Regions:
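Conserved sequence signature across two-component system core domains
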Residues: 7-8, 37, 53
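Hydrophobic residues at beta-strand termini and immediately following loops
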Residues: 37, 102, 133
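Two-component/phosphorelay signaling modules centered on CheY-like receiver
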Residues: 11-35
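Acidic di-acidic motifs
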Residues: 8-10, 85
């Protein structure tokens, strides 16, 4: 089962992102567990394993880049997709090898595209990720 984390201090973003991800996974028939966090400290306390994490860069108390570094130190190499209002963080964000960097506001088409790319990457990288992705041309 695919494990996805959404971490953004803005609950509005979490509430916008969750149904987009759920709908995408439902259409592709991919089972997943999705965890939501609005507090980066709680995320760091829990330190859950994940396949894909949507992570805000600018949060109170904890910076998303520092959160990602903490996960990397624990050898968690899931795919991190940054969400932010601040494009200037892109250079620094790449120090933890994120899979993607999306600017807000949330765009469903961009979310779906990066989800598809991340799932294809995970499937190629790890044989135990065999979930197949339904596209317009069939199952990949």
């Amino acid at each position: 089962m695919l494990s996805i984390i959404i971490c953004d201090d803005d609950q509005t973003i979490n509430h916008q992102l969750l149904p987009i991800i759920q709908q995408y996974l439902e259409q592709k028939k991919i089972p997943a567990a999705i965890q939501q966090y609005t507090d980066a400290k709680k995320l760091l306390e829990d330190m859950p394993l994940f396949d894909i994490m949507f992570l805000d860069v600018e949060m109170p108390e904890e910076n998303g880049i520092e959160v990602a570094k903490a996960f990397r130190k624990q050898s968690n190499w899931g795919q991190i997709i940054y969400l932010t209002n601040y494009a200037q963080y892109a250079q620094t964000a790449y120090s933890v090898h994120p899979f993607g960097y999306l600017t807000k506001p949330i765009d469903e088409e961009n979310i779906n595209k990066i989800l598809e790319e991340a799932l294809e990457y995970l499937e190629k990288k790890s044989p135990h990720h065999q979930f197949g992705v339904m596209t317009d041309t069939g199952i990949k």
